[in-house]
């Protein structure tokens, strides 16, 4: 499987370190790619496979912010291909406008209002978009997160050796549905070795040749079995590739019907 390296000029980056909670984009893209990054107290790995094209509707972004804080965003625009790719790029532009909002729920609220108003004014209607965003404090190990109708992230507890779903009760609307939506956030404490796995719904809705959907539960089990069979210490890039291969194996030999993006974080130390 080949991945295209995303050059820095593909997306314009904005440095805002002079402002409170100033964030600098380290990487963002909606193209086929595999990228690993080191942040304050955190490892990050992103692997993305658009369906039927080199770019699609999944946008992933990683920011380094002040106070040893890292921010990650994964957005999934309805559909795939050229139109969804344009929507993903629009979401990316909005991220730069609001990237310095510290609160994850506040970030989603601002994104949603602007996105919805833009959709109402645009001759080409923007599509509904799900988003998950999180901030990790490298000093305390606290991970704050919020959803806009996005699939639940998975939390790997290294000590217990199992994955858990994150965000019970966070039932918020996607971007573009209605202005004024109030989003909620939760937090979890990460210990060294703990991981966060965010993904687009293409990873859970993939169907076998017989028509059986992998489902969120099946994806969780696949993630656990994938991690169990990799020799330790597990490298995040190896885990991402092996998990993606597992998703593709469920699909069979045919191409994936939807964009698939996996964004994995692990607390270091």
Where are these regions (language model features)?
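… and, occasionally, acidic/histidine-rich disordered N-termini of signaling adaptors
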Residues: 3-197, 252-269
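C-terminal catalytic subdomain
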Residues: 5, 132, 186-198, 203-269
């Amino acid at each position: 499987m080949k991945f295209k390296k995303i050059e820095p000029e593909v997306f314009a980056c904005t440095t805002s370190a002079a402002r409170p909670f100033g964030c600098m984009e380290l990487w963002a893209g909606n193209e086929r790619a595999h990228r690993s990054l080191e942040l304050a107290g955190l490892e990050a790995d992103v692997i993305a496979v658009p369906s039927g094209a080199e770019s699609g509707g999944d946008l992933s972004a990683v920011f380094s912010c002040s106070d040893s804080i890292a921010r990650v965003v994964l957005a999934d625009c309805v559909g795939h291909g050229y139109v969804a790719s344009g929507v993903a790029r629009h979401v990316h532009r909005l991220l730069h406008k609001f990237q310095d909002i510290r609160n994850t729920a506040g970030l989603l609220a601002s994104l949603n209002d602007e996105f919805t108003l833009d959709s109402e004014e645009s001759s080409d209607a923007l599509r509904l978009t799900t988003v998950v965003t999180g901030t990790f404090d490298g000093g305390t190990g606290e991970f704050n997160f919020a959803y806009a109708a996005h699939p639940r992230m998975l939390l790997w507890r290294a000590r217990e050796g199992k994955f858990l779903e994150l965000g019970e009760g966070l039932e918020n609307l996607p971007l573009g549905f209605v202005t004024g939506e109030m989003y909620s956030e939760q937090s979890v404490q990460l210990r060294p070795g703990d991981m966060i796995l965010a993904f687009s719904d293409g990873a859970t809705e993939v169907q076998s040749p017989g028509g059986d959907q992998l489902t969120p539960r099946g994806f969780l089990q696949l993630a656990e079995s994938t991690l169990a069979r990799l020799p330790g210490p597990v490298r995040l890039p190896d885990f991402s590739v092996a998990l993606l291969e597992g998703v593709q194996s469920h699909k069979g030999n045919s191409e994936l019907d939807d964009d698939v993006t996996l964004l994995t974080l692990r607390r270091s130390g």
